[in-house]
Amino acid sequence: MRTEYCGQLRLSHVGQQVTLCGWVNRRRDLGSLLFIDMRDREGIVQVFFDPDRADALKLASELRNEFCIQVTGTVRARDEKNINRDMATGEIEVLASSLTIINRADVLPLDSNHVNTEEARLKYRYLDLRRPEMAQRLKTRAKITSLVRRFMDDHGFLDIETPMLTKATPEGARDYLVPSRVHKGKFYALPQSPQLFKQLLMMSGFDRYYQIVKCFRDEDLRADRQPEFTQIDVETSFMTAPQVREVMEALVRHLWLEVKGVDLGDFPVMTFAEAERRYGSDKPDLRNPMELTDVADLLKSVEFAVFAGPANDPKGRVAALRVPGGASLTRKQIDEYGNFVKIYGAKGLAYIKVNERAKGLEGINSPVAKFLNAEIIEAILERTGAQDGDMIFFGADNKKIVADAMGALRLKVGKDLGLTDESKWAPLWVIDFPMFEDDGEGGLTAMHHPFTSPKDMTAAELKAAPENAVANAYDMVINGYEVGGGSVRIHNGDMQQTVFGILGINEEEQREKFGFLLDALKYGTPPHAGLAFGLDRLTMLLTGTDNIRDVIAFPKTTAAACLMTEAPSFANPTALAELSIQVVKKAENN
């Protein structure tokens, strides 16, 4: 039906007869002449109808936005004065000789000339995807997956599929369950990741595996998460953590070079402890130049419990954040930041405005200055590198609250004051995470997952002091987003059972949930390590959007619903009966 795409026509096509298929993007009727912007997935081209082709011109007068049409015509060069430098096809136009209206369009529920609500965009997603910016994002996503496959093939990785219907295993979120009709009362789980299957593939001898795979997590959704998402999943045997990072870094550098024309350079490596100390986050945005500075040792003897308490508590921390030029902040803005940190558990936000440092106490403005002598204030200014016109904010509490609150404040202030360089790319690796963290109930939970190997510890040493264990894990972070994470896996049965025990999984439960894995570990398991990238998040970064739904063709809302198909929906009672399932309604509270 077509000979060319609209958006691919150039001066080299001048004089050629072409047939185009697509949609009316815009129509301009000048009486004796009628122009349309005709659109397909590759872009837009101007088509015009003149009186010499009266039949085509008459039919064109019926055209409206989003009519699906076919046009045959001749490509012509535009006059110099009519060239549109903002269009890829702006140097040419098509003189139509014939027009076919393939399908007409009703009045559109979306307005291309205004910003539509996200609810409307998701309900009429098939129309939203016609927009050039949306089409371009999905084309970029397709390019990314193609680049990934070629890179992985070139590096000896095998694309191997793993099951979608599997067994529920604890991986940190709730599973989506699928009832079995054949096995009454039993359920499959949709995979949160192919984690155990890819480890089993290593045990099977497939030493380089990858897969671009759908994963499912039934969890409360944030703006950058979806209940079903896509991973670039990777596993290797006989490779160390640095070797895995080297190959995966090369993959991401390749993507940025091919898609953005940007060389990311070598990625710096930072430990979890350093990232938390300097940035208050295990996924720091290095485009923001501000850092946290520990000042607890300067404040242990002050008669101000807000500072002295955490300063003298081994589990406490007092950190300062110097904001260049922050002295210009108003009291209202400071109060807003004070309320902001309370979201993260902080009780408030102390500060020092540095007006003229050389004047000592007279050169600052601070509600806590009365608790601090000139010597302590000067020591704080010296350590933070404060200059005239700067602001210093303080966080004082337990280590987690200080990191969370001050890390979030750092990001917000950096964005608000334009201190974060939005034009930069800032990748890094974060390594050496704690293996376990407090579960809030007196026990421990795995920071990554229970199949991650500890670093430089025997099973006996791990059992004796699990709180000291460092995971042989690594995350890739770009511009403050965790785009991928992985680890060296446990390849020894005793170590795996020790980890399960630390997590409160008794031997009976171990056999019930992971018996197949424990059995497999008995038969010459190779050392193995891997990583998974979030394809959706990578695409989000590479297309310059901050909404993950913009890079998924048919996404869900934050309530895990599809507004277009109205999924989820109630099941047919007969189908439920076949599955031996009965829906029980909760009693309403009177």
Swiss-Prot record:
List positions binding ATP.
R217, D218, E219, Q226, E482, G534, L535, D536, R537
Question: According to its UniProt record, where is this protein mainly located?
Answer: cytoplasm
Q: Single GO molecular-function term?
A: nucleic acid binding
Enzyme class (EC, first level): ligase
Q: Which reaction does it catalyse?
A: tRNA(Asp) + L-aspartate + ATP = L-aspartyl-tRNA(Asp) + AMP + diphosphate
- Residues that coordinate or bind L-aspartate: E171, R217, H448, R489
Enzyme Commission number(s)? 6.1.1.12
A GO term (biological process) for this protein? aspartyl-tRNA aminoacylation
> Which keywords belong to this entry?
Aminoacyl-tRNA synthetase, ATP-binding, Cytoplasm, Ligase, Nucleotide-binding, Protein biosynthesis
Please give the function described in this protein's UniProt entry: Catalyzes the attachment of L-aspartate to tRNA(Asp) in a two-step reaction: L-aspartate is first activated by ATP to form Asp-AMP and then transferred to the acceptor end of tRNA(Asp).
Q: How does it assemble?
A: Homodimer.
| Entry protein name | Aspartate--tRNA ligase
Whose protein is this, by species? Escherichia coli O127:H6 (strain E2348/69 / EPEC)
* Name of the gene: aspS
